[in-house]
Each structure stands twice: as C-alpha cells, then as structure tokens.
Amino acid sequence: MKRENILENITSAINYLEESMKALVEKNQKEVIRSVWRASADLEHALFLFSLMHQDENPSASWKLSPSAKQFEVGPTLVEAQDLLKEAKDSFEAQNFHEAHKKAWMARGYLLRVHDFFEKMWRKEGKTSS
C-alpha cells in the first residue's frame, strides 16, 4: 500500500509541475503558485511514506543541493525538480528505493527554493504597496 501511494504521489507531483510550467509560459502567476503548492504537498506525502518505509534511513548531507546562485529563475528550477522526480519515479519502478528517496528529497529542495522566491516577492510587493 505505501509503495503504491508513493508512486501515485510522485506521479501527481510531476503532473502538477507540468501544469506550473504551462502556467509560467502563460504568465499566470496564481496558477504557477497553486500548482507548485500541490506538487509540494504530494511530494511531502511521498517523502513521509518513504520515511515510514525506511525508518533507519535519514537524508544525508550528500543529498543537499549546492548553494543557490544569485540569479534565481523559476522555470529552470521547476524543470530541475520535475527531472529529479522523473528519475525518482524510474528508480522506484526499478525497486531502487534508496535512490528514489534521494531524488525525491533533492526535488523537494528545488521546490522550497521556488516557495522562497515567491514569498520574498510577496514581501517586497507588500512593502511597496504600503
């Protein structure tokens, strides 16, 4: 059951990221944010299930992303996250659960960067409109 749910959640996150990239091309920021949140929620659920499956395994320092560059771009970051999730799905289907967990964890890091970007943008907009 857990394995089935992990695969469903990863697949759903991939699909939501696809929607977010389409919305980005259409310059529909609200839809980008909504889709990224949905992808993140599904990914967090998958990671929770991974943690239940492998309680003795903790994400290691080698799973962390390199420090972000000064120039952040949403599009390439979403593509990177989606690529990692596709790799996670492939690894999962090949029953390489450790690698699937690692790739999903790394994709999470990219999605957190996107969330941080939009949060900073909202704060900046809030200060300029006050």
Model-derived features: positions:
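Long, charged/polar, soluble alpha-helical segments
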Residues: M1-S130
